Structures are given as C-alpha cells and as structure tokens.
C-alpha cells in the first residue's frame, strides 16, 4: 500500500458476538497495512479485550433503552445526542476513511457521527434478525451485509467472521474418519452457562449410559453443581469445566454439540463442520431461533425451543443418530458455512473507503 495507510474505525461492543467478528476483520486489514482504532464503551467487554489485541480504543457513553423505564426514555434523545457528539469528536481526530459497525449500542451514535462527517458506513449484521440499531443505521449506511439470509431483504449474505483456529480444523470427513466408541457430546452454555443445559444434560446422560461421553462447559460458578448433578445420576465420569479456553480443540474432539444458538456459535459450528442440537435463548424477537434455522433446514442440526428441550426428547434424538448420520450432518454443516466471511467483509470495507 503506497502513501498513508488507510484508516478504519470499528464500532462494536457489549458481547463477544459483536466484538470477536470485528477483531477478525480488524486483524485481517491490519495485516494489509491498515491503521485501526475501535469505538466502544468503557464498561463492557471490549474495554479490556480490544487493547489486548494491539488496537487502540476510544470510548463513548451509551447504553440500551429496553426496560429502562419512562425517565430513561425521556432522557434518551439527550443521551444519544451527547454520545453522537463524543463519537463525532473522536472521528474528527482520527479521520477514518471508513467505519465498520459490527453491532452493539455504540454503533448507533458512532454510525450517525460518521455519516454526518461524510465517512462511508459499512454495517454487518451477525444475527438472523436485525437488531434495532442496525435496522435504523441501514437507512444511512453505504453498504449493509448480513451473516444469515433474512435480516435485510437486499443485503449480501457474507457469513460471520470466525476465529482462524476454527477455520483451520480438518474437514469432517477427515476428522471423524475411523472414530468409534461412545458418541462425544460437547455441551456449551456460554460464559454465563445455560441453566436449562446444566439441569437437563446430566439426566440425559443417565438415560444414554455408556453410549455417550460428555464434555460439559457449565459457565461461571456452576461447575461443582453440574458435577454433582452428573454424579447424582450415576454418571460421574463425564468432564465438567467452567470455561473452555480452546474452543477449536473442543470442536475437534466432539461428534455433536448441544448449545445455545448465538450468531457466532452457530457460525463456528458450521465452519467446524459439526452437527448440533440448538436450544435458542427465549427472546421476544426469537433472534437465536432464526440464527439456527439455516442449519436445521440444511439437515445439519435440530432445534429444540426451550419448552421442548426435555430429557426424553434430547435422549431419543441423540440415541437415534448413528455415527454415519452424524458424519452426514457434519458435512452438511460445513457445506453451508461461509469460511471466507472475514475476507468478504474486509474486501467491502476496502472497496468503499474514501480515497
């Protein structure tokens, strides 16, 4: 790249589902010589995580409005205006050639500030149904991309950027070749765990006996309780950990995953090439259900809404999947993944950047 390096400001915050895809794109462009800064909030995960990746971060003050009450709603216009003013001042100093909104409340005032300064705005929607911030920002964005079809009617489907170690896993037909013995079930509840998984899966293990071996990620503070639940059903041999630091290794070990269906989780499971039982988090817009639906439609997964996630239903489903069936599902999952999502998003950022 000749002359001054291109400048990108990534706007993302709140959850790993927003931050990790943004980091993937940021690192890809930094490797090409881009200068990258981040716009976030000081009290969410990006404040600690982003600097650890060698990226400078600026903060604005903004939070969500749902469930905040009448006073908060009345004060919202002033809060949004102040956040917009803060973001605008930050962008006037940094002078980005393009901004990338990856979701979270910070993207709203950040995107509006960029638009008011004539800076191209690129949006990426990670979920199968668009969040309120991105629905609004799509009206002023230069480009809108989506991970799953349906969030925006005319947006290009580019997938979710996922970690390179997951993308580097051997294909299912290589990884699973010659496996025998008990079916390996990976249970993932996220960093906070998922109570319904923690309560149900030990009883599922009791029904399935020695036909399965389970690695159960319980979430913070729940490891002992879940270990006791397995022991209480006569299944103390299963592995329970509070966290899993190396998810790529866990995916490589597993034959099937039982988990929530956050956008990044679904995309990682598809990229790894794994069958799944998805238990969407119950939310009024059914966001996690729509994330998982493409994999179920492809014959790569089974969705259980939480009321249907019973011991009997899950045990019967797992018992009915042979190793041959699981391999077929794994290949279908990999076939619908978009492994070059990071490159696709980065390419669009490069295309629309100011020259």
UniProtKB/Swiss-Prot annotation:
InterPro entries: GlcNAc_MurG, Glyco_trans_28_C, GlycoTrans_28_N
Transmembrane segments: none
Entry binding sites for UDP-N-acetyl-alpha-D-glucosamine: 15-17, 127, 163, 191, 244, 263-268, 288
Signal peptide: none
Membrane topology: Peripheral membrane protein
EC number(s) stated in the UniProt entry for this protein: 2.4.1.227
Pathway(s) the chain acts in: Cell wall biogenesis; peptidoglycan biosynthesis
Chief place where the protein resides: membrane
The organism's place on the tree of life at top rank: Bacteria
Reactions listed under catalytic activity: di-trans,octa-cis-undecaprenyl diphospho-N-acetyl-alpha-D-muramoyl-L-alanyl-D-glutamyl-meso-2,6-diaminopimeloyl-D-alanyl-D-alanine + UDP-N-acetyl-alpha-D-glucosamine = di-trans,octa-cis-undecaprenyl diphospho-[N-acetyl-alpha-D-glucosaminyl-(1->4)]-N-acetyl-alpha-D-muramoyl-L-alanyl-D-glutamyl-meso-2,6-diaminopimeloyl-D-alanyl-D-alanine + UDP + H(+)
Pfam family of the protein (one): Glyco_tran_28_C
GO CC aspect terms: plasma membrane
Gene3D superfamilies linked: Glycogen Phosphorylase B
A single MF term (Gene Ontology): undecaprenyldiphospho-muramoylpentapeptide beta-N-acetylglucosaminyltransferase activity
One of the GO BP terms on file: cell division
Subcellular localization: Cell inner membrane
SUPFAM superfamilies on file: UDP-Glycosyltransferase/glycogen phosphorylase (SSF53756)
Keywords attached to this entry: Cell cycle, Cell division, Cell inner membrane, Cell membrane, Cell shape, Cell wall biogenesis/degradation, Glycosyltransferase, Membrane, Peptidoglycan synthesis, Transferase
Family designation: Belongs to the glycosyltransferase 28 family. MurG subfamily.
Entries under PANTHER family matching the protein: GLYCOSYLTRANSFERASE, UDP-N-ACETYLGLUCOSAMINE--N-ACETYLMURAMYL-(PENTAPEPTIDE) PYROPHOSPHORYL-UNDECAPRENOL N-ACETYLGLUCOSAMINE TRANSFERASE 1
Role noted for this protein: Cell wall formation. Catalyzes the transfer of a GlcNAc subunit on undecaprenyl-pyrophosphoryl-MurNAc-pentapeptide (lipid intermediate I) to form undecaprenyl-pyrophosphoryl-MurNAc-(pentapeptide)GlcNAc (lipid intermediate II).
Protein name: UDP-N-acetylglucosamine--N-acetylmuramyl-(pentapeptide) pyrophosphoryl-undecaprenol N-acetylglucosamine transferase
The encoding gene: murG
């Amino acid at each position: 790249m000749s002359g001054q390096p291109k400048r990108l400001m990534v706007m993302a915050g709140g959850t790993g589902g927003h931050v990790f895809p943004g980091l993937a794109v940021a690192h890809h462009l930094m490797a090409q010589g881009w200068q990258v800064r981040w716009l976030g909030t000081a009290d969410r995960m990006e404040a600690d995580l982003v600097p650890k990746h060698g990226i400078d971060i600026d903060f604005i003050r903004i939070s969500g409005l749902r469930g905040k009450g009448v006073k908060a709603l009345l004060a919202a216009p002033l809060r949004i205006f102040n956040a917009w003013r803060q973001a605008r001042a930050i962008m006037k100093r940094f002078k980005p050639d393009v901004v990338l909104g990856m979701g979270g409340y910070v993207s709203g005032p950040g995107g509006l500030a960029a638009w008011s300064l004539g800076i191209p705005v690129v949006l990426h929607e990670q979920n199968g149904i668009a969040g309120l911030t991105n629905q609004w920002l799509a009206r002023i964005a230069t480009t809108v991309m989506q991970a799953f079809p349906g969030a925006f009617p005319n947006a290009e489907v580019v997938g979710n950027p996922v970690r390179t170690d997951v993308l580097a896993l051997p294909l299912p037909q290589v990884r699973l070749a010659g496996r025998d013995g008990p079916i390996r079930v990976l249970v993932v509840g996220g960093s906070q765990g998922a109570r319904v998984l923690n309560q149900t899966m030990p009883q599922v293990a009791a029904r399935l006996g020695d036909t399965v071996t389970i690695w159960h990620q319980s979430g913070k503070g729940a490891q002992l309780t879940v270990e006791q639940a397995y022991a209480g059903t006569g299944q103390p041999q299963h592995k329970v950990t509070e966290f899993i630091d190396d998810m790529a290794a866990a995916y490589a070990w597993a034959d099937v995953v039982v988990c929530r269906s956050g956008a990044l989780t679904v995309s990682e499971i598809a990229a790894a090439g794994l069958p799944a039982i998805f238990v969407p988090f119950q939310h009024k817009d059914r966001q996690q259900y729509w994330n998982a639906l493409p994999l179920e439609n492809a014959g790569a997964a089974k969705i259980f809404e939480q009321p249907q996630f019973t011991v009997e239903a899950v045990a019967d489903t797992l018992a009915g999947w042979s190793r041959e069936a699981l391999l077929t599902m794994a290949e279908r999952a990999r076939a619908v993944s978009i492994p070059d999502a990071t490159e696709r998003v980065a390419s669009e950022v490069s295309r629309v950047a100011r020259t």
